[in-house]
Amino acid sequence: MDKKVARIRRASRARHLMREQGATRLVVHRTPRHIYAQVIAPNGSEVLAAASTVEKVIKEQVQYTGNKDAAAIVGKLVAERALAKGIQVVAFDRSGFKYHGRVQVLADAAREAGLQF
């Protein structure tokens, strides 16, 4: 089993539990160059809010998009967009990534901006 398959397996177990609870999820995906965050409806078929380092708004604010500073901006922005749509409580779906580094910074920034999880 390689690293990617193991991560996907961890993610599927966590997602199954969140779907059973019927929770709105804050999903994070991380690549070496970018980080993506989406707030997904409980049914899993609708993206309610999203932010990523691919967006021009964020690229203008940071020099490099694959670091903790960029992750903090993404976390704050996705939280603001979710709160604007009336979403306050979410379940944090780290997609099998370790809760460390950029994933942790994004989560902390989203909490500081007002999301609860």
UniProtKB/Swiss-Prot annotation:
Instruction: Tell me which InterPro entries the record gives.
Output: Ribosomal_uL18_bac-type, Ribosomal_uL18_bac/euk
Sorted alphabetically, the Gene Ontology cellular component annotations on this record are: cytosolic large ribosomal subunit
Any idea which UniProt keywords this protein has? Ribonucleoprotein, Ribosomal protein, RNA-binding, rRNA-binding
Q: Listed GO molecular functions?
A: 5S rRNA binding; structural constituent of ribosome
Q: Which GO terms describe its biological process?
A: translation
Q: Where is the signal peptide?
A: none
The entry's family comment says: Belongs to the universal ribosomal protein uL18 family.
- Give the function comment from the record: This is one of the proteins that bind and probably mediate the attachment of the 5S RNA into the large ribosomal subunit, where it forms part of the central protuberance.
- How does it associate, per the subunit comment? Part of the 50S ribosomal subunit; part of the 5S rRNA/L5/L18/L25 subcomplex. Contacts the 5S and 23S rRNAs.
Question: What protein name is recorded for this chain?
Answer: Large ribosomal subunit protein uL18
Source organism of the structure: Haemophilus ducreyi (strain 35000HP / ATCC 700724)
Q: What is the lineage of its organism?
A: Bacteria, Pseudomonadati, Pseudomonadota, Gammaproteobacteria, Pasteurellales
